[in-house]
Design a protein with these regions (language model features):
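Bacterial N-terminal signal peptides
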Residues: 8-16
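C-terminal amphipathic alpha-helix
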Residues: 33, 111-152
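Bacterial N-terminal signal peptides that target proteins for export
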Residues: 1-8
């Protein structure tokens, strides 16, 4: 038993001397409990493109002036960009899973703008996409990000 305690104590002290996380790991920002997940250039560029698409079309949706063919193009552009982000990004693990879920919310929301019969009204779909885009900088590290609504 004594040898087991000695080994356990040695392992304990060895672990104390080992840093818990690599030095280059992203750390929490002021006011945040957890660190944002990392992004890469493909994610940052693609998310800015999606944000700009939403921003450009926002008032057409809110004022109910978007023609159906324009709504279909808008939804298709957002879907293509979301697919491009997922195909070209080097994220893995939790970051990739959370990004996939966030992009699915955006695509589903904007899809409701194009196909209001899907059970979600165009306005509710736009709100869903806006909320996902507003949540993005809380979950991911994207310096300088501003949600679609704050840009108007």
């Amino acid at each position: 038993m004594r040898i087991g305690r000695i080994i356990a104590t040695a392992i304990f002290f060895a672990l104390l001397g080992t840093p818990a996380a690599p030095a280059d790991k992203i750390v929490p920002r002021a006011g945040h409990a957890i660190a944002p997940l990392p992004t890469d250039e493909a994610v940052r560029k693609g998310m800015v493109t999606i944000r700009d698409l939403v921003r450009t079309n926002h008032s057409l949706v809110t004022h109910r002036r978007m023609p159906p063919d324009h709504a279909l193009r808008f939804a298709a552009q957002v879907k293509v960009e979301a697919d491009r982000i997922l195909a070209t990004s080097n994220l893995s693990g939790e970051a990739q899973e959370k990004l996939r879920a966030l992009l699915e919310e955006v695509v589903t929301g904007i899809g409701a703008v194009a196909k209001p019969d899907a059970g979600i009204s165009p306005m509710d779909g736009l709100v869903r996409a806006d909320e996902a885009l507003a949540r993005y900088p809380q979950e991911f590290d994207h310096p300088g990000w501003a949600p679609a609504q704050s840009l108007e």
